[in-house]
Each structure stands twice: as structure tokens, then as C-alpha cells.
């Protein structure tokens, strides 16, 4: 599982000739890190008198940020898994008309399936941005940089 690799291992594989991880896995990793930074802002704000009026909301945002960061990490593997059939489809023979038709059919299905994960990831990132936007308003000014 990619999410269990250390950062150096992930970066090394990302920079290699390997088909995965690719842009989707890297995007998921960066989004999870961004959401973790949002959780850090919430943690640094929790319990501060200056932000007492937002305490309940900050705790809720913290919970959402921590959960979403974990969910985003799962997309590192989901992206690789959804790309695998497409990668295999690229390698199908196309010497005969039947092979070409079969490859075209498989490619169409694989492309559609492979696109679902990045779209779902983008939706999760939009959720993350909403949390970060709110934290920029109610979070500690010292933690937001």
C-alpha cells in the first residue's frame, strides 16, 4: 500500500518509470498533507480564550479534517488500482481487426473506470478546501501562514 510507504520511498517510486504512483497518487498525498495542516491549525486553536466563541465549531472542523486526511490517503492506492486495467489495456495487441475492435472496447471501458477515481478525489479535495476556508476565518492567526 502506497500510503504505508515513507515519504522518501514514495518520492523515489513517483520519479521512476513505474506506471504508478502517478499524478493522482501524488495529488492525494499532497491533499492529505494539506488537510493535516488544517487539522494542525484546529489543534493549535483549540482551547485558546481568544477563539472560545468558535470552540465547538473548531472541534467539529478538527474531526472532519482528521477524517478527511485519512480518506484522502486511501486515494493514493485507489488511483493506482483504477489505473491498472487501463495500463493493461494499452498493452493489448492490435494486429488484426478483431484485436483492434477488442482493444478499443476494453480501452473505452478502462478509460471510463479510470476517470472515476480522479473525479471522486477532486470532490474530496473540494470538501477539504471548504474546511480550510472556514479554518482561515476561525483558526488562530498565529497558526495560519
Give residue ranges: language-model regions:
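Conserved phosphate/anionic-ligand binding catalytic regions in large, soluble enzymes, centered on
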Residues: 16-37, 142-145
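Amphipathic, well-ordered alpha-helical segments in soluble domains
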Residues: 6, 10, 33-40, 75, ...
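A structural-propensity feature for long, helix-poor, extended segments
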Residues: 50-88
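Transmembrane signal-anchor/signal-peptide helices with a preference for the extracytoplasmic
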Residues: 40-52
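Amphipathic alpha-helix face/heptad-repeat signature
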Residues: 29-33, 61, 68-75, 110, ...
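Secondary-structure capping and boundary motifs in well-ordered enzyme cores
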Residues: 2-3, 22, 29, 103, ...
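Short, hydrophobic/aliphatic alpha-helical segments
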Residues: 2-20, 140-143
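Amphipathic alpha-helical interface segments
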Residues: 79, 83-145
Amino acid at each position: 500500500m502506497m500510503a504505508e510507504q515513507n515519504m522518501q520511498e514514495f518520492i523515489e517510486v513517483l520519479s521512476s518509470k513505474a506506471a504508478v504512483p502517478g499524478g493522482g497518487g501524488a495529488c492525494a498525498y499532497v491533499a492529505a498533507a494539506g488537510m493535516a495542516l488544517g487539522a494542525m491549525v484546529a489543534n493549535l486553536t483549540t482551547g485558546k480564550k481568544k477563539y472560545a466563541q468558535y470552540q465547538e465549531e473548531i472541534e467539529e472542523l478538527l474531526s472532519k479534517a482528521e477524517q478527511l486526511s485519512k480518506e484522502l490517503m486511501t486515494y493514493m492506492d485507489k488511483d493506482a488500482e483504477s489505473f491498472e486495467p487501463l495500463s493493461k489495456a494499452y498493452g493489448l495487441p492490435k494486429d488484426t481487426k478483431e484485436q483492434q475492435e477488442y482493444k478499443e472496447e476494453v480501452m473505452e471501458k478502462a478509460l471510463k473506470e479510470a476517470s472515476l477515481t480522479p473525479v471522486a478525489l477532486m470532490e474530496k479535495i473540494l470538501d477539504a478546501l471548504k474546511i480550510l476556508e472556514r479554518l482561515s476565518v476561525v483558526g488562530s492567526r498565529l497558526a495560519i501562514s
